[in-house]
Amino acid sequence: MEGNRPDWASLIDASATAWEWRDNRLYHKEAISEPYHQPSVGRLRRMLLDHVYAAHNASRAVRGALDRLLRELRTDEWAANIGAGVKRLHSRVINVDLHDSEVIDVVTRGQKLPFASNSLALAISQEVLEHLPKPFETIREVHRVLKPGGRFYCQVPFVIGYHHGPHDYWRFTREGIEQLFNPDHWTVQQIGISVGHGTGFYRIAVEFFAVTASAVHRSLYIPTKAAFSILLLPLKFADLLTPFAAERDRSPGGNFCIAVKRT
């Protein structure tokens, strides 16, 4: 580290004037003047969300794909996790997010990234594109910052209900994912199921009971959702059958894609 600058500071585009260093973190100037306030969530509710209801990132398929990509990241290469949340995947992964926290390196606004063109070997996006109003622009920006041959791991939902973060715009089928990647610029290496049809059914069933309860009183939505998140948890075990199902692409909870930058 040079002064208060991290080792990856050399990757930043010198012409990126909308960004400002504060100690060892990089902030978009709009993120400084208009800080993003994440809704407060109790510890118990957060544990239920992360480890029971919305545990997409912990699935065997997701862990296997990401572990392989991170193992192949060389010691002189860098990656970026766009929409990193509260977890650091690897020591050479730069965490990018809307809001600041101890593990975030770049606090951004909009869909622009501060990195120089052709500077990253890997980009990661887990359950993020559905929250962006213009996902095609994000894909183009990721393409810009990746080196030729660089890879993009993109994980998106399909059969799950609305969830603000702070907004929710899109759901993606296998064909929808293919449309995100212009074949003139990308080679789609793999499209897989991140969580299967058991999770898809589970998420919709939990919402069914929670939304129905809210017809009695709005305050019943959250406790009903919490209760049925636990009661219906065995439905997720049907995901074990998804890889063997001939029609597995019809109702998975989500999909992932690994795409390689061509030019």
Model-derived features: where do they sit?
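Conserved N-terminal segment of class I S-adenosyl-L-methionine
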Residues: 2-118, 122-126, 250-256, 260-263
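Glycine/Thr-rich phosphate-binding loops of Rossmann-like dinucleotide-binding domains
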Residues: 89-90, 133, 162
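Residues in and immediately flanking transmembrane alpha helices
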Residues: 94, 110, 122, 143-144, ...
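Residue-level recognition of oxygen-bearing side chains
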Residues: 120, 134-137
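GHKL-family ATP-binding catalytic core of two-component histidine kinases
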Residues: 114-116, 133, 173
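Short catalytic micro-motifs in class I SAM-dependent methyltransferases
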Residues: 127-131
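S-adenosyl-L-methionine-dependent methyltransferase catalytic module, highlighting the catalytic core
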Residues: 136-137, 141, 147, 151-262
